[in-house]
Every structure is written in C-alpha cells, then in structure tokens.
Amino acid sequence: MPRLFRFILFAAIFCGAAGSARAQYPFGKNKVIYQGRNWRVLQTEHVDIYHYAPDSTLILYLAPLVEQTFQEYSETFHLDFKRRLPFVFYATHYDFQQTNILPSLISEYTGGFTDLMKGRIAVPANGSYANLRHVARHEMVHAFMLEKLHRVMDDRGKFTYGQPPLWFTEGMAEYLADSPQSPQGEMFVRDALLNSRLYHLDEIWRIEGSYMMYKQGEAILNYIGTNYGKDAVIRILENWWTASDFSLVLKNTIGVDMFELDDGFQKYARRRYYPSMLEHEFASDLGKQLTPDGSFYNRPTATIGPEGETDICAVTARDGRVVICSGPRTEEGGWHPDVLVTGGRSGRLESIPAFRSKIEAHGDTLIFVAKNNARDRLYLWSRSHHKEIASWRFDGLTMLQSPTLSGDGRRIVFSAIEARGRMDLFLLHLEDGKLERLTEDGYSEEDPDYNPHADVILFTSDRGAGEDLNRTHIYEMVLATREIVPVEGGPFADTNPDWSPDGKSFLFISDRDGTPDVYLHRPDGVVRQTNVTTGCSVPAFMPDGEHFLASVYERGEFHTYEFPIRNPAHSLRAPLPPDTLQVPWSRADVDPSSFVTKPYRTKFGIDFVGAGVAIDPSAGDIGNGGQMVLTDLLGNHQINIIFGTTTEDFSSVLKDFNAAVSYTNLSHHLNYSLAAFHLNSFTDRVFLSNQEKRTGGAFALSYPLSKFDRIEASTVFRQIEKINPATLAGLRQRESITGSVYLSAVRDNTLWTYGGPLLGWRFYVTGGPTVDFLGRGFDSSLLQFDVRRYVKLGPRVTLAMRYVTRNAWGGDDLVFYLGGPWTLRGYPYNEFLGRTTHLFNTELRFPLLDGLRIVLPFGPIELPMFRGALFFDAGRTSRNTFSVLDTDWLGTLGVGAELNLGYAPVIRVNFTWPTDLVTIKKDSGFELFIGYNY
C-alpha cells in the first residue's frame, strides 16, 4: 500500500509545521503565530487561568469572575468537579485567532470555545467587560455540561454516549450565562417568528451553528425554564443515561417529547411576541429599503460625490468575502453600488470587519480599518481611483475601530484595543502621523464620532454602568481639555452616536423600550426616529440633514434603509439623567496576592488515539495500524505517533511493521518538526515486485508570510534498501544512504463552498535534490508545480482550472502516476506512469437541485444539494528511459453529478468519453468518486 501510507507518514511528519495546512496538504491557509508568549498560570481555588497579559487589570477582573461562576455553576449543575478547570485567556481576539488548541482557523466572529477532548476553555478579551463576562460564563456552561454528562454516564458504567443536539447545548449556555434574553436576542427570535423562519426542532439542523440557532436555542431553554422550572434543564442531563434518543430523555424528564416540546414552544413564542408586534411598525412603512433581498449590508455612510450627488458606502459580503462598496443614489431613488475595497485576498487586506467598526466617507476619501497580518491598519482610500492614499499601523495597538475624521480633515479619532486588552480612544494627526492617547482607564470607549464644526467627539462607554455591565451611555469629550461629559444615560444601552451635518444634534441607538431603535438627541430633548418590529443599528446622517441611513435586521438579513428625520414637537422626551462616572464593579479592590501565579510548564496529554484497516484496491495491498496524538495544554507542542503495517496478506503483518514519530513546535512564527521513521515493505507497480525498507530522520521548517502565503524547507536522511528484480539480478545496487533537501512555496486564498473551492487561487511549488552519500545510483532531483484557479461565473457557478506537473531526474526510480478520478478521469487508476507528468483539468460546476426530500415508511430523508459538472482533462507522461512507455497527449470529456452533504466529502459519479485529442470514443465510462473536488 505505497501511496496511502507514504501520504499518511509524510503528512504526520511535515504538515504539523504548516499550521492549518495540515488538513489540505499541500494547500491550506496559515495560522500565524506572530509573537511568542510568556505564558503563566494564575490559580484560583478551582480554576487555572493560563495567560500572558502584560496588564493585570483584565486578569484581576477575570479571576474572581470565573471563580464565582465556578461556584455558582457547581450549585446549578449539582456537580463537584474532581479536576481543576483549565481556562486559557487571550488579551485580544487576534491573539485568540492564533491559538493552537484547535487546529482549524478561527473566524473573527467566534467569541470563544470549549474543546471536547480536554475540557479546555479559550476566551479572548475584546475591549468590553460585558462581552468578556458573557463569553466566559457561556463557555463555562459547556465545560460543566461535559463534566456532568461524563459523571452521570460513568456512575452507571456507560462510557460511550452521544452529545445533546447543538441547539440545546448552545441554547443552554446562552440561557444560563445571561438571563433574561438580551434585546438583540429578542430581535432575532421576533424577526424569525414574524417571517416564518422560527424552525421546528426536526428542521433546526438547517441553521446548524448559526447565530440564529444560538438565539432560538436560548429561547427554547427559556421556555423550558419558565414552564418546567430552571432545574429541569439540569435534570435533562441527569437523566441522560435513561435513553439514547434525545426525545425520550425529554419525555423521561419533563413529560413531553421533542415534538410536544416544539409545539409548546411555538405557541409560547407566538403568545409572547405577537402582542408586541402590534406596537411596532415595519421598516418599509417608515423608510425606503436600498438593498436587495437576499443580501447583507451594514455600517452605511453617506457623503457628497464629485458632481454633487449623494454617494453611499457600506460594508457588504460579496462571494464569501467582506468588501466595502460605494455608489451614488439614482434619480429613481435607488442605489446600485460597485465594489470599492475587497478583503480576504492578501495579507495587506486580510479581512475587513463587518460589524465591529464603522466606515466614513468624506468626499472622495474613504476611511476604514482592516487587518494587516498581526494587527489592524488604518486606511485612507481614494474612491475615484480605487487605491490606497495613505495608511498607518501603530505599535502596541492591535485592533482599531470606527475611525472618524475632523471637519477640517486634519485629524482622525478612533478607538483601539491595546496588546494588553483594553479599549481606549486615540487621536491621529494626519500631517505628521503623530498619535495622541485621549483616554487611559479601565473603561471601554468605542464608537467615536467627530463633530463636523468643533473639536468635540461623542463616544460610547461603560463608565457609570455600575455592576450592570450591559449598560452603555453616550459621552462627549472636548479635545482641548479632555473633559468628558455624560450626555445620555439610564438603565439600558445607548450606542453608535452620529453627529448631524450642522453639529447641533446627533442620532444614536438605544434599547430603552426593549428594541434597538434610532433616537435623535436635540438640544431641547430626544425624539424617537424608528419603532420597527425587529431592530436597527448604526445610524448615519445623510448630507442634507433631513434623512438618515441605518441597518435594519429583517427576514434574517441586514439591509440598509433610508429614513426621514422626524421632528414632531409632541414626541419630544426630556433627556434621561446621566449616571455619575463611578467605577464599574470593584476591579481595583481585588487583592492580587489572593491568587497563586506560576510559570507555565509543558505537559503532554493525549488528544487522539485511533486505529483502522485500509485496502489499496489498485495494488491489492492491506494496511492496518494506529495513530496517537499528544499535545500540551496550549496545543503549541505536538507529538504524533503512527504505527502500522503494509503487506500483501495478513500473515506478514508483523514482518512488515512500520512506525514513525514526530515532534512539532508551533509556539513561534517559525514552526519546526523533527521526525524519525522506519518504513518497511512498500510495493510499487514499476516492476512486478518492489519492496523498500527506509529508516531515518527528518527535519522541517515552515514560515508563514501571511494567512495566505508560506515558505517551507525540509531535509530527510534515510538508509534505504530496495528489493526488486533489478537489484536481485545485480543490475542495480540494493542499499545506500541518502539525504534530501526540499524547498517549497505555497499560496492559498481560496474560499470554499460545499464540496470544493468557490473562488480564488492556490499554487504549490517544491523541488530539491537527493544525494546518494555512497555513490550507488540513488541520486535524484525533484520538481513539482501545482496551480489552481477558481472563477465565480454566477451564483454558485464556478469555473475550476488546474495544471500540475511533476518531474524527477537522476538514478533513482521515482515515478509519478496519472489516471483515475483524482487526476486524469476516464482512465483506470494509475494507468500511466512516468518521470515527468503534465495534467490539465478544466471543469464547470453548477447547481442541479437545492434539495431532495424522499418520504419513506420510516420517515423522510432530506438530501441537501445536488451539483453538476462539465469537464475536460488532458495529460501526458514521459520517461527518460523506456520511451516506449511514454504517452502522447490524452484527454477526457465528461459530465458529473454529485451529492453534497454539507462540508463532508461529496459523493460523485462521472460519465467519461476518453479522447486522443483527435477522436472521441463512442462508449462512455463510469466512475464513482468520494472526496473533495480539486
């Protein structure tokens, strides 16, 4: 079983040094560790907090929080933890995205996670104490749930069991972490109910993993707690042993099965939300929707264009990437924007934040922030020339947010999260690039907005919130004196202030009436501007001062609306009295000496153990073996052990034993791997029998240049023995000692959809020599090149192109293969071989059916998606000797159909017509393929 085991071994030895690329070797994006950390462990009574935070403020807030939550949940879950709870804390979200606890890439929208294997909690700070508190409590619910299920099943001698459905686990975490449901959560559920998108429990898999699933799950758990008691949620876990079916566990606990629970919840939701809907209005009755259905637009801003027209810019999603678009209002009042800035294609503009940061447009200049490798960069962008005017990165400032330009165009104020995790305000002088700090305290300051006619800014802050960290208020700062004055206050959240063009009033968002709506603050009072059924966010004045833009959530989408300013005198409200600037909570009163702090020490634990049997039908070989993966708690140090056998029959399993062990260090920007291996009894198809024994070691380096690019180097030393007809006849040497050095470059900025890439491109090039130290003819050189391009031609229609060439020179008999569904389709698997191969693939992929529901006597089966393909392949192989085995150019025309099962491999059938590029065979071939499309 040559290729299978060699691939597994090579991936185990080298791919660990390639970050997230290990899942798609040799391609894949990179998880870059931009800076090594000096990790320490702070120990409370029950929790170990792993951190590196240079500022103790966040740790002194977090430590009592997690300890108090631990004790609270111990009572809630009726659970006595028998181990210390590991809690890994990251000072910023960008640091969190570099974690190696999970091998996969982490998006900007992941607030934290709890891993199933070791029960580790990983949480970042994002500048908000309220968010940190919520996420920490949310993830600790997961840890307690996992421990509770383990204890319940272990006490009854049951060691294999399933997990609750995701809507239940995430809903429980939201429900127990922060009750009652937030206005934003209510907004999502109310919109779903209004638009018939509140899924029944047997169909909630359609929104698996989405934010809507979290919020609907929370609403269901709130219904269970309200009708059956809060303790019923825990009793469901305590009765987990009673049945393997979740519906039966519900029946055994609260007396209703899943269908009865669903029926009760749907009625409960209608009774709860329908009356409130009568008190609200549809956004379309108040303003004009500017964006089409089925789209996402957020953070709108408006300015005067070069010809006096009104231009609108907004953040949107195009083809899976977050972009900034811009365009004028049409004479008919519509808006048809074009893409202005695209993120997600290079390290320079790695990603554009879709929610956390606003954009501003002033004439031809667009102001925004985007991630640039390790931290954010502030950009000035020309809208007319579609290019960068200027940009800045600041030492010590990791994440920038909501830049706002002064009226004279000489200064920019923005909020930023420092490397130590706190969010403050900063002032940039554009003439000389001088940066001034405006605030330095324990509070969070965000959403700044510059008065167009004065050196005054508005911003949102949690100062004065007391112990209710969900409260935020609007404050005003006079830049000349740095004096901070509260403007709006009360027991609710006020956010996103936006000055009017005359600088005398401002819009803001408030949930004071239970729904996030737009309000206008005037010198003489406050006027409510919207009263929509769902909710609004991020208002922005139009240049005329008589209208404003806002994002409205409806039908599960964010849309940009234009609303008229309302100024009715009878609707005037007095401004609510602002709170004093008291210190929230009592963070400064925590005694650091009450906790024990120790340096972090690397200790390995098992992450994965597996075994299996594999058969290579093309060679008739049998392989069986196992794998063990050990990592430290942070995932930075990994040991991978592989053992098994490749044999031609079961009688020689022990004789042909194989083993490899590798160590990978991922704790720094430069990753490295060490490996040792003993590989025995490979069989190849160059001769009737080709056995190889290889024993040696390897060393590999991987240096990511960005999320999308990396360079790699590796060296392998091995003792090799070949047993085949040529060596047995004395025509070639049998043994030698060789060394190889390879250099590689990889780029991958593709975006994936179900079954394969959607758009972007990727390439991989590697090459290097193998030296025979004993001069016995095993010298060789290798060069491989693989480039792939994906072009989106329409909605879910992709043109995929690939060119691969593999070349070997020298005395060794290394060859490459073509043929089969992975390479040259329409021909038997590995039909052609050579020391040089060329392969072209072109394929048009398109949707066939979005879903197929088959009703059977035992229940319905839903198959989510069918896709089709038209393809043409061409390939050629050649050898330096035995030229009779060379092939002319051969090709294949074909059609394919595949079943997509989410992110699982596709099940695909191909009908092929081989060709010599002159004639086409009349008889078609048939192929079955299970895997991912190239």
Q: What is the meaning of each model-derived region?
A:
Residues 23-159, 163-165, 249:
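Juxtacatalytic substrate-recognition/specificity segment
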Residues 30-33, 38-41, 208, 235-238, ...:
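Beta/coil-rich, acidic/histidine-enriched accessory regions frequently appended to metallopeptidases
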Residues 167-168, 172-182, 190-259:
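Active-site-proximal alpha-helical
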Residues 295-297, 315-325, 329-332, 344-354, ...:
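A flexible loop/linker signature enriched in serine peptidases of the S9 family
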Residues 306-308, 361-363, 407-408, 452-453, ...:
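Residue-level detector of Asp-centered blade-edge/turn motifs that repeat once per structural unit
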Residues 328-331, 382-386, 429-433, 478-482, ...:
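Short loop/turn segments that connect beta-strands within beta-propeller blades
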Residues 567-647, 654-659, 706, 863:
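Interface/linker segment at the passenger-translocator junction
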Residues 621-683, 693-700, 711-717, 729, ...:
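C-terminal transmembrane beta-barrel domains of outer membrane proteins
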